[in-house]
């Protein structure tokens, strides 16, 4: 694993906007930006309890309240705060929630993206814009791993919403020369994720409490997992590369550790990190999900020089320890 650090001279005093800053990836990315000295403005829709990650940066950012679908608010935000770099992360990010409420998902993920794109089109100060797509946008493919030349063949509601967001971003670059690039990542994990419905947080909490981990699928689904710090650094690396080579606008990049795991394999690795040996409760109730999906990060390695900095085993051990401390603090 290699070590890469962002260029503080590039980020210092740079006007940056982050949508979705209070989300899991967004909170880590915003923490990095604040530490680098960027002038960060965040778009916030709802009041959510701060995590230990977001609590550290909340006093140091400018907050604009509004929905990401509100183009007028975005135009005011980009203009008033003279945004040069925009990270568009705001989305409804839960597959199960998307299946239960597709309309709200389409409004947030599709209408939200076209509002960001149109506001960016009308905001000539913006030099780099990054849209968060997903490995889910590829849909079920006959050959794996996914690479960036594969068509976006999403079918299920969440997957379609991310594919549409991806294509909208490409369209605004091709048609209007909006300087946008696209990230396609797998499942983020690491410190600060308190969504217990997700497999890593839920499993960590169960193991620490001595309870059987619960798997809602049959455990054989293959997925891509990326530590959130490596994910945040991927976004920073992409923007710095876009600054050095504006020709990267319009490109999509996969970011991955290239270590695909079944859900059962992931749980076994978490048990090894936690020092437990509990039999998982396999529910087999997951539906409308793709059996196997994982990414090739070859393009990101070759074009951007990006590589993950944390091995999978170290990342899982780091994550277990964070939850152990967090849950101990909650019990006091």
Predicted segments, located by residue:
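C-terminal substrate-binding subdomain of Rossmann-fold SDR/epimerase-dehydratase oxidoreductases
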Residues: 35-38, 207-332
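Solvent-exposed, non-membrane alpha-helical residues enriched in polar/charged side chains
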Residues: 75, 79, 117, 170, ...
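Active-site loop immediately N-terminal to the catalytic Tyr-X3-Lys motif
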Residues: 102, 192-196
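Hydrophobic alpha-helix immediately C-terminal to the catalytic Tyr-X-X-X-Lys motif of short-chain
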Residues: 164, 168, 172, 203, ...
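N-terminal Rossmann-like NAD(P)+-binding domain of SDR-like oxidoreductases, especially those catalyzing
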Residues: 1-186
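Radical SAM [4Fe-4S] cluster-binding motif and immediate context
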Residues: 189
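The catalytic Tyr-centered alpha-helix of NAD(P)H-dependent dehydrogenases
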Residues: 154-161, 196-200, 224-228
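A glycine/serine/threonine-rich, flexible loop-to-helix segment
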Residues: 144, 195-202, 270
